[in-house]
Regions:
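Nucleotide-activated donor-binding/catalytic signature segment of Leloir-type glycosyltransferases, i.e.
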Residues: 119-138
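A short, gly/pro- and small-residue-rich
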Residues: 1-5, 92-95, 167-171
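Active-site and donor-binding regions of nucleotide-sugar-utilizing enzymes
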Residues: 1-57
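Alpha-helix capping/helix-boundary segments
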Residues: 27, 111, 158-159
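Conserved catalytic-core segment of nucleotide-activated headgroup transferases in glycan assembly
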Residues: 46, 51-123
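Structural alpha-helical scaffold elements that stabilize or flank donor/cofactor-binding regions
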Residues: 13, 66, 95, 145-146
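A donor-sugar binding/catalytic signature common to diverse glycosyltransferases
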Residues: 12, 139-171
Length: 171
């Protein structure tokens, strides 16, 4: 992921490695500062980029972006404890359904894997809403919903980086 090295990993997660692959200069800066603060020996830091994001940026840039009939809201939460799907998704959806949006709920693939029954129950609770207004995405083989969205709502998933840096739209 392209996220920070100190936002989500364990506090000492990178301390004892000799070589670390870095998705960007922000990770290099964070690791160097951590080495300095903790008195750790310098590591070999390899800046390799973030292939997924590089490919998404290229694909999105090559696409045409015709005007849409209505704004698309992509709800794309993480899967860890206290994620939006478990805490507040019903209330969120109730606030936006019927207000002229196309809503896509795209959970992290791990959510469906671990919490399939919850995912199915959520879809059942909103089964009466037409799929052209509320769509529950479970095919993660493309980035189409990321590219189509006008805005993304997420918790602390790194998909926010993919969306905002690829489309230059708000998360």
């Amino acid at each position: 992921h392209a996220t920070s090295t100190h936002l989500t990993p364990h506090v000492n997660a990178f301390d004892h490695y000799d070589v670390i692959m870095c998705a960007g200069p922000h990770q290099v800066q964070e690791i160097r500062r951590t080495e300095e603060l903790k008195g750790l020996p310098p590591k070999e830091l390899v800046e390799y980029g973030y292939d997924l994001m590089d490919k998404e940026i290229a694909a999105y840039s090559a696409m045409e972006h015709p005007p849409k009939g209505r704004p698309v809201v992509l709800i794309a939460p993480s899967w860890q404890e206290d994620n939006m799907l478990d805490l507040c998704i019903d209330e969120m959806l109730e606030q936006v359904i019927g207000r002229g949006y196309r809503i896509i709920v795209r959970p992290h693939p791990e959510y469906i894997k671990r919490y399939g029954a919850r995912w199915e129950a959520l879809q059942q609770r909103f089964a009466s809403v037409p799929s052209d207004e509320l769509y529950f995405e479970s095919d993660f083989s493309s980035s189409d919903s990321i590219f189509a969205a006008d805005v993304m709502v997420t918790d602390w998933s790194s998909i926010s980086c993919e969306f905002s840096f690829t489309t230059l739209k708000p998360t």
